[in-house]
């Protein structure tokens, strides 16, 4: 059994040759400043996130991309390069805690992820910035905008809203399937990936979803493991699917990109009222009938 250590086009007006800076950190760290991954005692201790920064014009607000659950900064490789070339802005892609090359921690709260991002943005001098978050990353972006509106020049939330998405999520099944995968040691990577795909297919019929999850399969000294922190993500899944209730509001320019066939935001439902569902954001809300796939 394994251990686990259509593109959306953003309008040019919303955002504005580059070189690259990268940072990778050890894959296992812990934070003791939480109580069970949901409710946080005091300010959570920020972790040093892994990131990739494409250089650009320093006088323009940088574009920062935040991935969703089981994702990583590599999800945005193509769009990040395109945005850097098209807008001449700095573009930052980041691995969230418990994902990609960033450290692992038992604290999966959005407060903790917001603190991580605030620390990184200050470290890199990217305040204020245009914050673009998909799914889990969208909730992190929304929370940061509420906590520190001066940090977020503009906000883009992709296929997500500040609502509980647990009832429509299949992620629990995905995590159970990933945990059950069993790959022998010292097999070729291509064969290991094929074995994992075959085992996942009994639960996850969509090959696109399987290929996305398999981006997390890594080899360390002949042993294959999942780089996402499955134990912690599974334990605190409900907290990840929910959104912290906050009294603040964010008055900056905000764009919600909602997929027409999204399972996470049922905007086509007659009961969906943007002003009631999104009370903390400006009344101008753009709902696009697109597939929000990254």
PLM regions: where:
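Alpha/beta-hydrolase fold catalytic core
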Residues: 1-64, 81-90, 126-127, 284, ...
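Flexible "cap/lid" loop of the alpha/beta hydrolase fold
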Residues: 142-192, 196
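Conserved serine/cysteine hydrolase catalytic core
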Residues: 218-281
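Conserved alpha/beta-hydrolase catalytic His-Asp/Glu region
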Residues: 169, 186-246
